[in-house]
Amino acid sequence: MEKNKPLELALDLLKHSNIVRNNEYRFVTPDFGIVISFTHMESRLFRLGQPYRLKEGRIIRGLRGKARITINLIEYNIYPQTIATFLPGSIIELLEFTPDCDFQLIAADKDFLPLLRGDQLFESHTRQNLVMQVTDTEWKLSDAYFTLIWGTVQEVPFRREVVQHLLAALLHNIKYIRTEEANDTSRRFSHQEEIFWRFIALVNEFSKNERTVGFYADKLCLTPRYLNTLIRQVSHQTVMEWINQSVILEAKVLLKHSNLLVYQISDELHFPNPSFFCKFFKRMTGMTPQEYQKR
């Protein structure tokens, strides 16, 4: 694959690999895809410890085993009977998984859903609650949706409108589950935790350009000192540690999956000069940018 931009885990990857339809385990079009068993598909898309950017939104159902991942800096575990939704543009990194790990996946472009802009429907899922362990009843219902969508895509010709509406219904149902969780007082976030999640969203959005505590404090209408204290109390990390992690994540994506030179990546990430970027990268990772590229 030509390295001309940061690699996105996109439906295009499967399309360019001449994998358009596999009746046994997967079905893919330019703007919609479903995988009924990732293990049996024998995909080699993922490498441990390598960040990727998601082009389309994703729905994941954990079937067996366990996977440990990070989504936009935050670590999650995918267990059996887990449902996860990942927003378009998210950066995902697979940290580890058990040999028996298997899951199902639906990916859809933002323009695929007919009744509502697809990105709005995915965005309606709260950023701090991307992964849920669901009840037996909700798990069976999600299985019914996946089974119905899978059965529908086997029909010829492709029943696009039917799949669009089934997917919209599935996303709305997941939204209902999240709403119930949000109304559960035992799971409700504290005021400090709410600020933390707002801070993380801001870091993911602005860290390429803004790397001062004051910027994020202003956005949250707090003093820099109070923000630093609050973030440390909630996460056991400082504001700058979170910002630096976000910058490193973006740098890794650019180093591995673009044809940009190191000095161009330094400019892209708004470092004063390449030397400063290289020192920062080595301090954070223990290796130079060039060494990371060659791994």
Predicted regions and their residues:
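Generic protein-terminus/edge-of-domain signal
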Residues: 1-66, 76
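A hydrophobic/aromatic-rich effector-binding and dimerization subdomain
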Residues: 2-4, 19-25, 94-151
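Short beta-strand His + acidic residue motifs that chelate non-heme Fe in jelly-roll/DSBH
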Residues: 68-70, 86, 92-97
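Short acidic-glycine-tyrosine-enriched beta hairpin
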Residues: 73-87
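Short hydrophobic/aromatic patch on the recognition helix
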Residues: 81, 227-228, 276-277, 281
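Short, Lys/Arg-enriched, Trp-marked, Pro/Gly-tolerant hinge/linker segments that flank
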Residues: 133, 156-161, 174-201, 205-220, ...
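Terminal helix-turn-helix DNA-binding modules in bacterial transcription factors
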Residues: 233-275, 294-295
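…primarily DNA-binding HTH/wHTH and HhH modules…
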Residues: 278-295
